[in-house]
């Protein structure tokens, strides 16, 4: 009997566990179904958004008792992650609030919590979308207009804070302004005087804020034909135009208007008091930007008109397109399809809007959000999906860019070159070059012939020399790159008269016999007895080794021995240039390899770039490509050491706290301590700190070298021009000052650490104002 009872008990326990698992499984299925329904609401083409919402409200209302928290979480996530469907979800919340007032209050509290957490964690876009969602709930009679205005007033209070960066004040003002298109009409009808008071406070702030950063972020230095407006100025002009139109915009879908009879009967909730978190130095706010304009209505053919630059519809369309790119940029085909599937696409010249927004992303200053090739690949997919119209719009855009290239920012010039060469390589290098032949009459340093020359150099990397020669008209012969071949002087006809030839031939013979690095070192040890000078010996040694990938790897020890001093490293770089002067790509990859193998230091590369020998190459793109990859190598090294030190300190701290907790715990609750192998010793941490400190010193030295050389050559040019009575604003000067600005902006996060040092040592008040202004604009970006 007892045995049977035990068996029955086991069966009952098994049945209980099985039923529990079944319930959990069923609940999970229901939760997944609810999430799918909420995410896809409004996307069915077979029925209207309104009928979708009615059906979903019925489903959710029935499940609120069991899945309340799940529904709250999904809806708040949708508000942040799918801002393009903001009004659909606010309508859904409004209908649920009309049926279940308690749930409406819980959702408002949940959304307020999301907004506050986003601000605290510096998730700026999420915070802005949360604020927009809360504002749109006013339209759905979920939140009272009075409490929203109180919140907006509290946010605008940030603009009156003292001793905080302007970028903080700017962001909070931008968050409020970008919310008004959704709720402005309702506030205008219900609380006009309070709304006007809010706008007046914003206007006062905008009129007094500094815009020193503006010129540093412009794509073009000229405002013809389209002004390059600062983002807050542009949005303020759009809001003022919207106010003149009585807050009536034509772009935002408002499904809640259909349900107005239901929603207006619902009770409203008041927002709690929300105070923005205070500023502290570790917070990084979004940087300002300039609104990019390429087209206006005159550029578009017959059909829908392009909204004006100061219409709020232009802002809403562009913001939506930017968000599509942000969401789908990892998959170019999906991204292109989503862009072409833009809502209301029949009401606007969509192709023009898309092309303008993509170039706005590509030319965004100080750096684009994604790699250049990301935008190029999306444009290629767009041309494939829309072959009848998009290639023509893109060609028109390219023509506009080329005609305005004279005043284009140097960084944007580089990106334009990279994009256009990549685009040509995907379309058989076909282009109507004859239409640009007027540039052949201009000076070689002028941006137009310089652009074509740099494009052909990039095309050469993506093709081969004969192909480039065949694709270009004969009139462009002077802009076509020379054949990229090595110039090894010890095999030339004059080699017999060159010092070092004997040593060079001896080394070449040994290398052909597959000698070891040690044998090469022994040969080099005999050089002093040959009677050559140090420089001659170095030239012979480095040229004989014919620096290439295999040579660098196999004879790494030899190179390290030869490159013990910075002078020797610069000598190596001189010889690389002498050997590969006609092969820019080889120069870039070889120097990159030398840096990786730590044969040359970053400071040596910077010094070499500004040497007199490189004067003829100074305005060529590849030289600055080398400088930037050098700076990036240094930056990555510092970041790596900093991360490793932080991790080690964290492990050490956790190990200490774990040890103390273990001592206090009872034997039954004792935690597993961190093992000795996992815990770094204090000596190891100290050594890591020393390494990081040394790396920071080297990084600072690198930036000091670069900026000091810029100041020297620019000051010399300005002084010489003043002495000779010539206009200093030459093509060379514009390229050089543009490269100085490019270094500041491309590496702004790292340079910012040393801004006070730079101001004290280099960018002093007695410096020429043209050079000093570049530094002041850079500092203003984070001011």
Swiss-Prot record:
InterPro entries from the UniProt entry: ARM-type_fold, CBP80, MIF4G-like_typ-1, MIF4G-like_typ-2, MIF4G-like_typ-3
Location relative to the cell: Nucleus
One Gene Ontology CC term in the entry: nucleus
GO molecular function: mRNA binding; RNA cap binding
A Pfam family of this chain: MIF4G_like
Residue positions where Phosphothreonine is found in the record: 9
Entry keyword set: mRNA capping, mRNA processing, mRNA splicing, Nucleus, Phosphoprotein, RNA-mediated gene silencing
Annotated spans, Disordered: 1-25, 652-683
Subunit structure: Component of the nuclear cap-binding complex (CBC), a heterodimer composed of Cbp80 and Cbp20 that interacts with m7GpppG-capped RNA.
Stated family: Belongs to the NCBP1 family.
Name of the protein described by the UniProt record: Nuclear cap-binding protein subunit 1
Primary gene name: Cbp80
């Amino acid at each position: 009997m007892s045995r049977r009872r035990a068996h029955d008990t086991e069966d009952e326990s098994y049945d209980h566990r099985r039923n529990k698992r079944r319930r959990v499984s069923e609940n999970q299925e229901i939760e997944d179904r609810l999430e799918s329904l909420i995410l896809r609401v409004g996307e069915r083409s077979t029925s209207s958004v309104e009928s979708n919402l009615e059906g979903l409200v019925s489903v959710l209302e029935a499940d609120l008792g069991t899945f309340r928290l799940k529904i709250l979480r999904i809806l708040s996530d949708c508000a942040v992650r799918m801002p393009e469907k903001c009004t659909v979800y606010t309508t859904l919340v409004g209908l649920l609030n009309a049926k279940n007032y308690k749930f409406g209050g819980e959702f408002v509290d949940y959304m307020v919590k999301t907004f506050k957490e986003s601000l605290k964690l510096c998730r700026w876009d999420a915070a802005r979308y949360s604020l927009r969602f809360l504002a749109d709930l006013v339209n759905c009679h979920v939140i009272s207009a009075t409490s929203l205005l109180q919140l907006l007033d509290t946010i605008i209070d940030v603009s009156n804070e003292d001793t905080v960066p302007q970028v903080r004040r700017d962001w909070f003002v931008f968050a409020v302004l970008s919310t008004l298109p959704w709720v402005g009409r309702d506030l205008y009808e219900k609380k006009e005087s309070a709304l006007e008071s809010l706008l007046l406070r914003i206007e006062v702030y905008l009129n007094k804020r500094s815009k020193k950063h503006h010129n540093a972020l412009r794509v073009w230095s000229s405002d013809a034909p389209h002004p390059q407006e600062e983002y807050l100025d542009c949005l303020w002009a759009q809001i003022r135009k919207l106010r003149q139109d009585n807050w009536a915009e034509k772009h935002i879908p408002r499904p809640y208007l259909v349900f107005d009879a239901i929603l207006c009967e619902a009770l409203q909730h008041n927002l709690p008091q929300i105070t923005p978190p205070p500023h502290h130095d570790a917070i990084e706010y979004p940087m300002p930007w300039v609104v990019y304009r390429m087209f206006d209505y005159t550029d578009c053919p017959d059909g829908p008109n392009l909204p004006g630059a100061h219409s709020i519809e232009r802002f809403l369309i562009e913001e939506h397109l930017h968000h599509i790119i942000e969401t789908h940029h990892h998959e170019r085909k999906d991204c292109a399809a989503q862009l072409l599937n833009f809502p209301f696409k029949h009401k606007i010249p969509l192709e023009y809007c898309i092309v303008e927004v993509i170039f706005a992303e590509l030319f965004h200053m100080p750096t684009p959000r994604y790699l250049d090739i990301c935008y190029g690949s999306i444009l290629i997919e767009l041309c494939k999906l829309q072959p009848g119209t998009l290639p023509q719009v893109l060609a028109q855009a390219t023509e506009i860019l080329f005609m305005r290239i004279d005043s284009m920012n140097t960084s944007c010039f580089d990106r334009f070159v990279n994009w256009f060469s990549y685009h040509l390589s995907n379309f058989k290098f076909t282009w109507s070059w004859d239409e640009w032949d007027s540039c052949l009459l201009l000076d070689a340093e002028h941006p137009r012939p310089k652009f074509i020359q740099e494009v052909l150099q990039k095309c050469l990397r993506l093709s081969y020399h004969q192909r480039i020669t065949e694709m270009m008209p004969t009139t462009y012969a002077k802009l076509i790159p020379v054949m990229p071949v090595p110039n090894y002087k010890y095999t030339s006809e004059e080699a017999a008269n060159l010092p070092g030839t004997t040593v060079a031939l001896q080394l070449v013979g040994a290398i052909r016999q597959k000698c070891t690095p040690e044998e090469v070192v022994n040969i080099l040890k005999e050089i002093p007895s040959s009677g050559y000078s140090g420089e001659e010996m170095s030239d012979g040694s480095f040229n004989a080794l014919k620096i290439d990938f295999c040579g660098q790897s196999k004879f790494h020890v030899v190179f390290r021995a030869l490159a013990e001093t910075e002078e020797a490293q610069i000598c190596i770089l001189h010889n690389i240039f002498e050997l590969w002067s006609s092969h820019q790509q080889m120069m870039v990859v070889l120097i990159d390899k030398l840096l990786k193998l730590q044969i040359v230091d970053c400071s040596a590369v910077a010094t070499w770039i500004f040497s007199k020998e490189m004067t003829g190459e100074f305005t060529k793109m590849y030289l600055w490509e080398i400088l930037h990859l050098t700076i990036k190598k240094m930056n990555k090294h510092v970041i790596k050491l900093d991360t490793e030190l932080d991790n080690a300190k964290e492990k050490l701290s956790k190990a200490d706290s774990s040890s103390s907790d273990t001592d206090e715990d009872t034997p039954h609750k004792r935690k597993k301590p961190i093992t000795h192998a996992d815990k770094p010793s204090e000596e190891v941490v100290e050594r890591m700190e020393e390494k990081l400190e040394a790396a920071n010193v080297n990084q600072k030295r690198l930036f000091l070298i670069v900026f000091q050389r810029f100041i020297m050559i620019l000051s010399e040019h300005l002084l010489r021009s003043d002495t000779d009575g010539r206009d200093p604003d030459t093509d060379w000067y514009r390229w050089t000052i543009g490269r100085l600005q490019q270094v500041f902006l491309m590496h702004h996060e790292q340079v910012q650490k040393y801004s006070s040092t730079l101001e004290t040592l280099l960018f002093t008040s007695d410096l020429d104002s043209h050079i000093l202004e570049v530094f002041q604009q850079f500092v203003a970006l984070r001011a």
